[in-house]
């Protein structure tokens, strides 16, 4: 399904229990809807599921101007208004988690889940594609996503981004949102891997301290894609947190 928001053709999926509370799933940079469906598909009985292809990814068009992270958040908010969603539960991975943090600092949010989410500048040691492909190969249930990753992720995020998306990426990487995070009031769950080389585990402990009502779950030996590497455990933790 598609809608036009802020001059972007926004692709999304909505499924599950329309009478339940809404879970909004936000993927990371260079990814798309498919990377969050392993979570969404397991909550269809009790929750209304909304997954977006963020602007510039998947089947959503690129922004016609350079979007800031705040622009992405405003677009998400307008899209949810169009879908008549109020006070969503937001689950975001990496870049999507950063947008979730900003969303919850501005708009009323039921609960927030951040999966390895950056919030200040971090020096990356290895490419996101290399880590993702390694993770997908190790997890049997996620093998089908390996081809997707090969198609949709370049050797580096920056090199493969178009002019507009490249400038958006630079803005995202350099944006420090610590002061915004201090405004978050909703219950927040953080899930991190100890071997995350994109957003270090030290950042997870720092983020936990910045949010008034936050809890941290750490997966020993897992990477930036810890939520997929321990998918069963992730689902169990989420069920407990979401109630």
Q: Where are each of the predicted segments found?
A:
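Catalytic histidine-centered segment of alpha/beta-hydrolase-like enzymes
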Residues: 222-231
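Flexible "cap/lid" loop of the alpha/beta hydrolase fold
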Residues: 98-140
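Alpha/beta-hydrolase fold catalytic core
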Residues: 1-23, 44-47, 86, 120, ...
């Amino acid at each position: 399904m598609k809608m036009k928001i802020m001059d972007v053709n926004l692709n999304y999926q909505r499924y599950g229990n329309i009478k339940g509370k809404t879970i909004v799933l936000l993927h990371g940079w260079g990814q798309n809807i498919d990377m969050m469906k392993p979570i969404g598909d397991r909550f269809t009985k009790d929750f209304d599921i909304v997954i977006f292809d963020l602007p510039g990814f998947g089947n959503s068009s690129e922004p016609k101007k350079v979007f800031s992270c705040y622009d992405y958040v405003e677009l998400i908010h307008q899209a949810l208004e169009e879908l008549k969603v109020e006070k969503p539960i937001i689950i975001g991975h990496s870049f999507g988690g950063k947008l979730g943090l900003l969303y919850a600092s501005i708009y009323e949010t039921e609960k927030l889940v951040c999966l390895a989410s950056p919030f200040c500048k971090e020096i990356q040691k290895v490419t996101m594609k290399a880590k993702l492909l390694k993770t997908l190969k190790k997890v049997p249930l996620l093998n089908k996503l390996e081809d997707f990753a090969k198609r949709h992720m370049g050797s580096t995020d920056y090199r493969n981004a178009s002019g507009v998306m490249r400038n958006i990426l630079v803005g995202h990487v350099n944006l420090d949102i610590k002061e915004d995070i201090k405004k978050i009031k909703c219950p927040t769950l953080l899930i991190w891997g100890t071997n995350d080389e994109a957003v270090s585990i030290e950042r997870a402990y720092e983020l936990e301290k910045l949010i008034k009502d936050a809890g941290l779950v750490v997966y020993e030996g897992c990477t930036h894609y810890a939520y997929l590497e321990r998918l069963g455990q992730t689902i169990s933790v989420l069920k407990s947190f979401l109630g």
